């Protein structure tokens, strides 16, 4: 029988802070998973000698992506962007330093009870755009798009899936 490999869904987002020793803290949930997209950039490298290509490879050159969620709590602002939670609100400063995080999530293998787990290492999130819409005869869902970058860890790890 063929192995099921079609995927669907997106759920159970967690983030884990990257520590100085390149290990991670305990993962923390981020609720309201809607969508994630990460584009990893690989630069083609080619060298020629004796009028012919004698080396060709692709080298990881970082990445970027977008995580879409239904909204953010004050704690999630603190976790993702390094913003300060104070006096019942969130204070975002130009001097905030967003921590590097592993972005963890799962997808279902269609037609099975199995799932695929993902860990994108060394992600850094930018605070979201502030936007609002008037209600014109109905309510439309408004989501929050979080842009992030991805880099490799010192041993070259970019992501893991199982």
Regions found by a protein language model. Give the residues of each.
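Short secondary-structure transition/capping segments
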Residues: 13, 115, 146-150
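Short amphipathic beta-strand/extended segments with alternating polar/hydrophobic composition
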Residues: 25-31, 116-123, 161-162
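Solvent-exposed edge beta-strands and adjacent loop segments
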Residues: 2-77, 125-140
